């Protein structure tokens, strides 16, 4: 090992800091022997995650030694305010050190100094040898070490601090952190600062004067009470700063690049068995692997004794709880509301959790004898700084809803670090993602259901009418479970770099964009829709009369029974399919097949199409307009389709028709306000381009690289004709083949779609694969890989589970094989449009433009653009979307402009 290799990394963990935090933040677990193990489990989980995230060539876990340090000699009151260590915590120190060593982490404990000093010395050695150092800690003192070669990471808050991060968080450069802390004081270490000087004042002074020495020199110029307080502490400040400076020259028994060790699997197995860590034992493999479900350890502790939750009944209680939350690295957060409609719901209460504690803040409960509550206005005045602070990390379950609710009260939630719904969606997309299911699955914890608290059906009461004591049990448990589920789920995501990327770089930032889009809403011309509804009604009456004439009698066109009688008993049409009860089917597939040869089924289909347009769109959409905004505000679900595709609900804006003239007219009602235009930016043939990238097929890549019409190019290959001689019918067939094969279409399906013989369809498919052998090879390899792994992945690492891929049932297995081919393309397309949304939103935000993102529909982004921003937006949106990822074929975006959505698309 060359100590001068600039690519090498030293990974250091502040073991004492994490031990304390894990003890106070995680459930109180006990081993089968009755030993406390909660902190041990938390630290070991963190170490395993760090090892996976940072491929370090040397690493160590550093602990404080027993006894006084040189700082105690200089200042006897140093850390004198700390209570004695709880016995359950003290009992875990030596077993933890033993476990760290077994895990392959050298352990360092040096008498007379603190862990911070040892870490600083090792980082200094590594810096001098050109190594990079990553320090995992929650201690702000170590920010003084940060430079271009030293980075801090905080696994509990998911925060990374480089020099820019230190400046952003503290307002000063790393080399001024000790000056900053000398002014603010360090309450944890009992080092006093200047009375009434907080982080903002300290940062302002250092920015203004340059250093602590300069602040001292200009003390006489600073007026007010803080100036007086500063002048009273001038003699103390140099000493306070000395106490806060970490030593970088501690005498150590080992060099930094000698801190290497391999895990001792036998020792680990013995320790995991002793501690009862069944999940970690299972990760080692062997007989114990199936001993218990993944989250058995916290489950038993959580279920055995329902937590005692706190009700924040008055302002004093809230202030005390807020002071504690401000010191927490991560807080579970949830809201209770008047309803579930995001744009109109208002607060009834809020719940918070950290460690093993949780509390409920009732705000607007109304029932006979309900006690006085703080009230929404006063509570938000107190909580707003914490709620909006980006440095105060929060975790929630479906936080987008809570962010809407707070926005309804004028609060912009900051510090959104994690969302357990998204964690579950990324890690286990095929599972249920609601909190009750997550708690049961990962904690073994059966939660109180909403129905248990509010009742069901006609007897259901509003949450505001729920008695506060009962509301506390339910609401605080939600925040508590959210926090606990995150502690189990996130380490699993963080341990796999590709999943971590999908979660952190796609899903979390996409949530913020979707929130913005939902709140922007879409302007709807309701008068136009009402006129269309009237016209559709007239057309339906016309089709109804034509159907009566074709049937030879009046009948109810909405009655399957009467349609059966007319079609199959009176007109003797062939029965194509039967219902489960043995009756002739009149579903859409049957009518479409019959419509090829008979007039009445065709009329019935046309009538049904008109009826659906009227009932689903022209009649219903105007009722969805928010009276306060005059706009339609849909709700985008990120955790809907396992491929990552977004779903739109209440109303669904992603299935607005486009294939028929009447359907397209509905899009005319989606309009821009006066002075603005609708801009549509749509990825062209995105899934085929992804297939070209994934398969590496030279024919497909060549067609896309040279801007050819890919369907015409495919037709030329399949039918063996020159590109300029391809007929319209040949191109149509090639288009069906291109898209059909992506969806795993068989020869039978292709024959049905094209209305040709199955043998002819098979010839087309064989010809296609003989010309595009890369596609065939990719499909075969993907199926084989899916059978082996049980899943497939998108280009960006989204995992798509295929539980039926090895099923003994041929139909289920073949369906899974089709999914294995299609899912990576659909999933990659979903990832791309999310990345595009993020890029466009970031640009709009950065440039402070008035342009609004208003819709995402499959591969299309829709914007509302003021006319004076139109040209810039068209160019920039196309550029951003086309360059959001570098595939092996170019991404092409078609941009259209109009007064309404139909004109723009």
What are these language model-derived features?
Residues 232, 257-261, 840-894:
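C-terminal structured "cap/appendage" subdomains that terminate the fold
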Residues 2-6, 29-30, 80-253, 440-442:
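Extended two-metal-dependent nuclease catalytic cores across DNA- and RNA-processing enzymes
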Residues 538, 542-545, 549-602, 770-818, ...:
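C-terminal polymerase-core module
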Residues 461-464, 512, 516-519, 574, ...:
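Conserved catalytic core of nucleic-acid polymerases
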Residues 159-188, 440-470, 479, 483, ...:
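A short, charged helix-loop
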Residues 11-17, 135-138, 142-143, 152-169, ...:
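Conserved beta-strand -> loop -> alpha-helix junction used to position metal-binding or nucleic-acid-contacting
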Residues 233-369, 388, 397, 425, ...:
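Conserved "right-hand" nucleotidyltransferase catalytic core of DNA-directed polymerases
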Residues 3-11, 15-60, 76-88, 97-102, ...:
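Conserved RNase H-like, two-metal-ion catalytic cores of nucleic-acid enzymes
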């Amino acid at each position: 090992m060359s100590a001068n290799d600039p690519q090498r990394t030293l990974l250091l963990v502040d073991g004492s800091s994490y031990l304390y935090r894990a003890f106070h933040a995680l459930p109180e677990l006990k081993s089968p022997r009755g030993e406390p193990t909660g902190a041990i489990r938390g630290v070991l989980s963190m170490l395993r995650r760090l090892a996976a995230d940072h491929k370090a060539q040397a690493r160590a876990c550093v602990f404080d030694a027993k006894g006084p340090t040189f700082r105690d000699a200089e200042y006897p009151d140093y850390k004198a305010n700390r209570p004695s260590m709880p016995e359950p915590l003290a009992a875990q120190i030596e077993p933890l050190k033993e476990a760290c060593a077994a895990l392959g982490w050298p352990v360092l404990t040096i008498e007379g100094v603190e862990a911070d000093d040892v870490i600083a010395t090792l980082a200094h050695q590594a810096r001098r040898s050109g190594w990079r150092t990553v320090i995992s800690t929650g201690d702000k003192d170590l920010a003084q070490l940060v430079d271009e070669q030293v980075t801090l990471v905080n696994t509990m808050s998911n925060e990374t601090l480089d020099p820019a991060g230190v400046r952003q968080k503290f307002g000063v450069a790393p080399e001024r952190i000790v000056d900053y802390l000398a002014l603010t004081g360090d309450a944890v270490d009992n080092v006093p600062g200047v009375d009434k000087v907080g982080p903002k004042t300290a940062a302002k002074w250092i920015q203004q004067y340059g250093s602590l020495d300069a602040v001292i020199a200009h003390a006489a110029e600073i007026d007010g009470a803080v100036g007086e307080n500063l002048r009273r502490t001038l003699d103390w400040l140099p000493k306070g700063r000395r106490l806060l400076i970490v030593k970088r020259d501690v005498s150590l028994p080992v060099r930094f690049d000698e801190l290497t060790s391999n895990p001792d699997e036998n020792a680990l197995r013995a320790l995991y068995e002793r501690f009862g860590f069944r999940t970690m034992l299972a990760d080692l493999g062997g007989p114990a692997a199936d001993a218990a479900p993944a989250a058995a350890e916290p489950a038993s502790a959580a279920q055995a004794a329902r937590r005692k939750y706190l009700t924040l009944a008055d302002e004093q209680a809230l202030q005390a709880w807020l002071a504690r939350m401000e010191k927490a690295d991560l807080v579970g957060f949830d809201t209770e509301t008047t309803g579930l409609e995001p744009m109109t719901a208002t607060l009834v209460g809020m719940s918070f959790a950290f460690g093993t504690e949780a509390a409920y803040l009732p705000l607007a409960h109304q029932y006979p004898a309900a006690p006085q509550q703080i009230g929404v206005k006063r509570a938000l005045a107190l909580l707003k700084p914490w709620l909006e602070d980006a440095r105060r990390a929060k975790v929630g379950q479906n936080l987008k809803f809570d962010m809407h609710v707070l926005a309804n009260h004028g609060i912009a939630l900051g510090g959104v670090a994690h969302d357990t719904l998204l964690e579950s969606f990324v890690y286990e997309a095929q599972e249920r993602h609601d909190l009750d299911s997550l708690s049961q699955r990962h904690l073994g914890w059966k939660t109180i259901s909403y129905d248990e608290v509010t009742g069901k059906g006609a007897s259901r009461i509003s949450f505001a009418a729920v008695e506060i004591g009962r509301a506390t049990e339910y609401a605080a448990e939600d925040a508590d479970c959210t926090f606990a589920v995150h502690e189990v789920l996130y380490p699993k995501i963080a341990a796999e770099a590709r999943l971590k990327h999908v979660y952190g770089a796609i899903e979390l930032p996409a949530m913020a964009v979707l929130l913005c889009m939902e709140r922007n809403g879409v302007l709807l011309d309701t008068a136009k829709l009402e006129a269309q509804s009237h016209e559709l009604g007239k057309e339906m009456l016309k089709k109804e009369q034509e159907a009566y004439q074709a049937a030879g009698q009046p009948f109810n066109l909405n009655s399957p029974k009467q349609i059966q009688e007319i079609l199959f008993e009176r007109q003797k049409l062939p029965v194509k399919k039967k219902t489960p009860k043995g009756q002739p089917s009149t579903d859409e597939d049957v009518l479409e097949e019959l419509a090829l040869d008979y007039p009445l089924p065709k009329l019935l289909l046309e009538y049904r199409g008109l009826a659906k347009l009227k009932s689903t769109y022209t009649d219903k959409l105007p009722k969805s307009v928010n009276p306060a905004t005059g706009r339609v505000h849909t709700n985008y679900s990120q955790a809907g389709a396992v491929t990552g595709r977004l779903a739109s609900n209440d109303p669904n804006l992603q299935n607005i028709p486009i294939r028929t003239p009447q359907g397209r007219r509905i899009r005319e009602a989606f309009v821009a306000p006066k002075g603005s235009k609708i801009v549509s930016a749509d990825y062209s043939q995105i899934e085929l381009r992804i297939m070209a990238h994934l398969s590496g097929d030279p024919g497909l890549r060549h067609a896309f690289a040279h801007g050819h019409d890919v369907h015409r190019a495919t037709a030329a290959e399949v039918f063996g004709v020159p590109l300029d001689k391809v007929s319209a019918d040949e191109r149509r067939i090639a288009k069906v083949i291109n898209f059909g094969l992506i969806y795993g279409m068989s020869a039978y399906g292709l024959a049905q779609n094209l209305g040709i013989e199955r043998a002819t369809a098979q010839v087309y498919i064989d010809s296609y694969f003989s010309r595009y052998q890369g596609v065939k090879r990719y499909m075969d390899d993907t199926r084989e890989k899916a059978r082996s792994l049980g899943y497939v992945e998108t280009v960006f690492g989204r995992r798509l589970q295929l539980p039926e891929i090895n099923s003994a049932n041929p139909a289920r297995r073949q369906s899974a094989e089709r999914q294995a081919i299609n899912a990576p393309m659909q999933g990659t397309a979903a990832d791309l449009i999310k990345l595009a949304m993020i890029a466009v939103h970031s640009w709009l935000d950065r440039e402070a433009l008035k342009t609004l993102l208003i819709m995402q529909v499959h591969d299309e982004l829709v914007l509302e653009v003021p006319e004076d921003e139109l040209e810039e937006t068209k160019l920039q949106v196309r550029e951003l979307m086309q360059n959001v990822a570098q595939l092996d074929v170019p991404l092409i975006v078609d941009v259209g402009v109009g007064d309404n959505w139909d004109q723009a698309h």
